[in-house]
């Protein structure tokens, strides 16, 4: 019996298919990532950041779910599953936190995510 052999042409086609499949899967996983982060900072230097438990209480009382609350370099970072949750939380925290705190969207350091968000936001400008 003869064993079937893979020709060079078949090997190239299989490799190209696997490469395309890998690229598609990586693109899909990047596009699905919609995580959003808010940063709470004190306006005045030396002022303490708000208590994470009070922030948790305000968000929970308004039905806003979050992934994590993390202190980092004199600010409090709150991570959400979606930009909609982040926007709702910003509205609630702007109303409930005392004056002297700034609630702002945290810029993502990942360059790929920045480019994808730019393309999503400006897609209506094409054509």
Curated annotation (Swiss-Prot):
Q: How does it assemble?
A: Interacts with EnvZ.
What GO molecular function annotations does the UniProt record carry, in alphabetical order? protein kinase binding
Q: Where in the cell is it found?
A: Cell inner membrane
Q: Which residues lie on this side of the membrane: Cytoplasmic?
A: 1-10
- Output the Gene Ontology cellular-component terms: plasma membrane
Topology, Periplasmic side: 32-127
Keyword Protease assigned: no
Q: Which controlled-vocabulary keywords does the entry list? A: Cell inner membrane, Cell membrane, Membrane, Transmembrane, Transmembrane helix
Q: Which gene encodes it?
A: mzrA
Q: Which family does it belong to?
A: Belongs to the MzrA family.
Q: Which residues cross the membrane?
A: 11-31
Recorded protein name is Modulator protein MzrA
Question: What is the protein's membrane topology class?
Answer: Single-pass membrane protein
Specify whether Cell cycle is a keyword of the entry.
no
Q: List the disulfide bonds.
A: none
- Its main localization is membrane
Function description: Modulates the activity of the EnvZ/OmpR two-component regulatory system, probably by directly modulating EnvZ enzymatic activity and increasing stability of phosphorylated OmpR.
